From Swiss-Prot:
Highest taxon of source: Eukaryota
Classification of source organism: Eukaryota, Metazoa, Chordata, Craniata, Vertebrata
Motif (LXXL motif 2): 115-119
Acidic residues composition-biased segments: 220-231
Domain text: Composed of three domains: a modulating N-terminal domain, a DNA-binding domain and a C-terminal ligand-binding domain.
Subcellular location: Nucleus; Cytoplasm
Protein name: Progesterone receptor
Annotated region (AF1), positions in chain: 456-548
Covalent link Glycyl lysine isopeptide (Lys-Gly) (interchain with G-Cter in SUMO), residues: K388, K533
A single GO cellular-component term on record: nucleoplasm
Amino acid sequence: MTELKAKGLRAPHVAGSPSSPKVGSPLPCRQATGQFPGSQTSDTLPEVSALPISLDGLLFPRICQAQDPPDEKTQDQQSLSDVEGAYSRVEATRGAGGSSSRPPEKDSGLLDSVLDTLWAPSGPGQSQPSPPACEVTSSWCLFGPELPEDPPAAPATQRVLSPLMSRSGGKAGDSSGMAAAHKVLPRGLSPSRQLLLPTSGSPHWSGAPVKPSPQPAAVEVEEEDGSESEDSAGLLLKGKPRALGGAAAGGGAPAVTPGTAAGGIALVPKEDSRFSAPRVALVEQDAPMAPGRSPLATTVTDFIHVPILPLSHALLAARTRQLLEDESYDGGSGAASAFAPPRSSPSASSTPVPGSDFPDCAYAPDAEPKDDVYPLYGDFQPPALKIKEEEEGAEASTRSPRSYLVAGASPTTFPDFPLGPPPPLPPRAPPSRPGEAAVTAAPASASVSSASSSGSTLECILYKAEGAQPQQGPFAPPPCKAPGAGGCLLPRDSLPSTSASAGATAAGAAPALYPALGLNGLPQLGYQAAVIKEGLPQVYPPYLNYLRPDSETSQSPQYSFESLPQKICLICGDEASGCHYGVLTCGSCKVFFKRAMEGQHNYLCAGRNDCIVDKIRRKNCPACRLRKCCQAGMVLGGRKFKKFNKVRVMRALDAVALPQPVGIPNENQALSQRFTFSPSQDIQLIPPLINLLLSIEPDVIYAGHDNTKPDTSSSLLTSLNQLGERQLLSVVKWSKSLPGFRNLHIDDQITLIQYSWMSLMVFGLGWRSYKHVSGQMLYFAPDLILNEQRMKESSFYSLCLTMWQIPQEFVKLQVSQEEFLCMKVLLLLNTIPLEGLRSQTQFEEMRSSYIRELIKAIGLRQKGVVSSSQRFYQLTKLLDNLHDLVKQLHLYCLNTFIQSRALSVEFPEMMSEVIAAQLPKILAGMVKPLLFHKK
């Protein structure tokens, strides 16, 4: 018979006197020592130690703040009577003899005893017991109640979890209770080590409300029943939680001590100094609670751990590895919420989904993308960053059941819980900026489905709409699909529309969240097109002062050949008819080059070999025109390529026998002798692929920093974040024009950009500092240049010294622009996931081609095999060293992102998404760096 005995030092417990836990109580948990301060325990209730930095809303934005109950005692009293009722019924079940489902064998293990106690079938003489507390022996608790719980915050979050944790109404003996009792456990876990989520249609865990005594008294459970095995009791003494028993089989009163007579009993987890399982005390409450609520589902902190800042590198890596190393997390209970964007960022400003306390950007990782649309709680990578090969309809988002996360080696599937519609939003004020779109609220019925299948911001950039309707101005909003259709109406360039009703769907769609960006014709980015919140800040209009409109892009041949509205001949500037002999040229220059090379004409310039070759004067000097053709990379034996963004282009370029480079005769020599061209003549040529890389280099980007005001830590970091956002957009545009990159799978394209964006930015910073200020300062942008004095005055001086190493290496090695362009592409291809890419073969071919281009770029300056090999070693060693340097930037960026509210630092939307999705993986070692040399 289980007896509840009051805990005291030596004397019996007296009602009304406070009691304290004693050493050797049946339910203690070992205090884990760590770098976090332990919690102090008072005489009556466990007391939570205050966090040094408030993380409420920073890591886990509270969704239902407006629903906080006014009376906190009411919720606590409700939790009280439920445990009392469950306690008494389980005791009645255990004392009933034959009616108990617990096996009487002496050697029964903890597994069978916990299974039988928890999942006893419902019957006329039995009651449904409450589930046991989650107990995890690891020092990193994933979603159990061992995490610190803040008692004052409990009532504020009880109503949030009620749709997920409370069972629906049902009778005690229906078949749903039997189904719940025979659920298959997750593989690799014992019943006492998993989180038991309720299933839809299961009966209530009811408990009869009992009048409490006015004074709380902590009691402990002692095992005295002779039918219980010794190993079960021994495991209990080691901190294993178990179901509690209460009343006798005959329907008598619960057997408790006098101090706890007729009192409700509730489980109160005691805070641990780190992450170990809490002690469980049975504490009387002041008022009864309505039945139907689980005492274990009281606060969000039962399922989420909020780390105490500052975070060390080792702790962050270990914690993230714990969350991400399982290859099939399919739940959204908050595994990645620790890295969710702060409430101050636009990505955290979306409309909350009722019943969920976490933003849509925090999901569990998914090692292998599935065929169906990514569900609301299904993927660690944010839906706004998960790009699908084909756009799917909204019906896929309603598939059921969804997989919810259960701690264990494999996920357990539970049916959907009903989620209420988001609250209606009042109409926004008219736009005050030119071209700003009026944001309208999406229909409530489609909010959830559109949030789960909405298009990505990177997808909007990578896949520009070809058949889009004409815009009202240079910055008019692009059309979007209806919320139910899922994703923006931005199909691939090469993919036809898969929906016959796409035009009709777009006609009735709400406009995009933000006005179009105007970055060379790119559509505007939005976090999730169907999740709209009143007063969502407009992030991008300030960029418009620094970016060129569409009207200017058609005048320059420095963008992707396929995306240009008019293709320009690289020789004379006329309209190009295609790629001829390896270069984009017009038909006239194509025929001229062919006749000049095949006829072996000897042309002589009447001037100084610097004649202007354009559409009007291209026939004036054939010698200068032919020289310009050769310098552009035209080779008579080369293939006639239709498209430059194919890997076969680079393979074919290697087959072209480019002559060995020699110096072009200077002007004095040209005046005294004839300048003869022939197919076998040695001329120094820039390889055509490097020439293309030079043409697609992004324009100068400004930071928008106000240099008239004194520098502060928050203003500098905010300006750098705004600059980083613009550079990230520029990287996406640049990679879209990169030959071979569009051949990779779309998921691989996004992954490579997310893994390498920091490397590309700091590498570009080093190049600008090297070219403009000779490596003496950090040239972030023309309006943000930090000399050594400004570096010392900043709060990240050590980080500036780290970044300063790159331009100093450029000065030391005297890197040429051709070498820089090839190294920049290799940086984009320098980090891949541990499991590899989907287009791994195409990726390796592309990377090998650009390595050969780097060798060609080295050969333009270095003569001889030995010097070229030494140069190649020096440059590739610099690329390898960037991995460790960028890792320091990643750690600083993530810590600043987590503490952005406390530091008053703003993070733009797209940058926030990339940081929250990928930086934890990178810092935890979940990626594979591709090194040229062994360490």
